[in-house]
């Protein structure tokens, strides 16, 4: 936050509990007011939301890549692989997401030392959320793959010898 005039870690007890700027007692420089230690509330919210947005977007991208990859390959190849992936997906969908995230975090705490876990907490959180949310993406992408793989342009690509990877990612996925 290079353009933030208010450092969230600095205190100003003289500005403690300043009301928002739209009230009569409020100051224009503190749009949402200040907390008990004089920190600007808007700056604190923006500073905190940065981490939340990074974790949220990263977890969704991780779940999307994992779920679409597994769903696309399961729908395209079919057979026992599809059955295995979709049964695993069904089992994971029965476990609540928060419980799965706690399980992943607990396993990470058991594997990684405490100091290392403190440094990697955001990455563990992204992984835990992504692992608990990928089945929704897998089901949707598998269903779309089953619809698309029987169309003429996919059959034509198979006949002329295009590889399965190219068919999946250039013809079916888009």
Language-model segment annotations:
Residues 8-11, 53-57, 109, 122-124, ...:
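Short, functional N-terminal and low-complexity linear motifs
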Residues 31, 41, 62, 66-67, ...:
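Generic hydrophobic transmembrane alpha-helix motif, especially the helices
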